[in-house]
Each structure stands twice: as structure tokens, then as C-alpha cells.
Swiss-Prot record:
Regulator of type 1 phosphatases which maintains protein phosphatase activity under strict control. It comes from Vanderwaltozyma polyspora (strain ATCC 22028 / DSM 70294 / BCRC 21397 / CBS 2163 / NBRC 10782 / NRRL Y-8283 / UCD 57-17). Keywords: Nucleus. The gene is YPI2. Belongs to the YPI1 family. This is Type 1 phosphatases regulator YPI2.
Amino acid sequence: MNKKKTKICCIYHPQDEDEEGCTSDHQHDELPESSSSSSSESENDKDLGFDERRKRRVERRRRKLRDNTDSAPNAYEVQPDYSEHRKKMMEKKSNNT
């Protein structure tokens, strides 16, 4: 029951400077240079603010969804039609009685 509580740097930031915690020498708001952006993002998005990047990302998503509406749904998205099977079962049932 005597578990030591640990503070995780990227989640918890102490309010008092004299508290021991994470020595934050990194920036949470900036993306590291080594991480590559997704292939759908253009190079121009790097210089834009959060809201503008989000706006462009949403627009790309909407455009992609709009372009994909012509494609046929996959097998998991199509509800099977059992009406013929039901008719056969009803006929079989009525013939047996």
C-alpha cells in the first residue's frame, strides 16, 4: 500500500518552482523536427498556426470523403437481403402443413 507516487513530465507540471519534477527543456507546443508530417500534409502547413492547419486538415478530410462516396460499400457495410430466403422458408413451411 506504500506506493510511491511519480510525476509524469508531459502530463503534470508543478505550480511551485521549488517542487521537484520534470526539468522541462522541451516545448510541448512545437513539433520536433525529426518527426515527419503525414504524406497528406503539404509543406506549406508547417508555417501555419494551429487553427489554419486544422482548417486545412478538415477540408482535406471532407474532400476525401466526398470523393469516396462513389465507391461501392464493402461487405461489412452492406446489409444482406434475406427476403428470398424468407419466402422459400415460408413456402416450405406452408407445404409441410
